[in-house]
């Protein structure tokens, strides 16, 4: 396996600069064999913010993740727009102090795993990007039976 480039500049692609209200995240994925990348691996983007919230309710942030393409290159990048936070309405014990924690967006898209290109994501400045790499623990194919 070859050593993957470690900077966005190594790709010589004209990815846009982040606007003054954005920050740009770049993820370099570990190289896998071609068929595995296509069939087994997926990358999940988990945008969100670190916020003070009560310790009981489940919270999430409204918003969207839009896929865009560099014209003439075919390289994709993602732009995150974040909206307000929503929460469940369970009662909180009196005196429970708020806690700082990462609150994810409701939309957490799965995108193809491709180690040949960087994953470039533009987020609002107050946002934070987490991600997960998904793969089957044990490749197993079965045929469903009739009952």
UniProtKB/Swiss-Prot annotation:
Xref: InterPro entries: Ecotin_sf, Prot_inh_ecotin
Signal peptide region: none
Top-level taxon of the source organism: Eukaryota
GO molecular function terms noted in the UniProt entry: serine-type endopeptidase inhibitor activity
Pfam families recorded: Ecotin
Family assignment from sequence similarity: Belongs to the protease inhibitor I11 (ecotin) family.
Name under which the protein is recorded: Ecotin-like protein 2
């Amino acid at each position: 396996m070859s050593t993957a480039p470690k900077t966005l500049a190594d790709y010589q692609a004209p990815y846009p600069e982040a606007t003054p209200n954005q920050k740009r995240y770049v993820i370099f994925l570990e190289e896998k064999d071609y068929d595995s990348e296509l069939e087994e691996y997926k990358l999940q983007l988990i945008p969100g913010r670190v916020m003070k919230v009560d310790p009981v309710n489940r919270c999430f942030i409204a918003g969207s993740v839009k896929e865009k393409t560099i014209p003439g290159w075919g390289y994709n990048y993602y732009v995150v727009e974040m909206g307000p936070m929503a929460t469940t309405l369970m009662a909180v014990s009196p005196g429970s102090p708020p806690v700082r924690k990462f609150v994810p967006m409701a939309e957490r898209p799965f995108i193809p795993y491709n180690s040949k290109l960087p994953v470039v994501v533009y987020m609002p400045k107050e946002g934070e990007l987490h991600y997960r790499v998904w793969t089957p623990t044990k490749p197993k194919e079965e045929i469903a039976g009739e009952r």
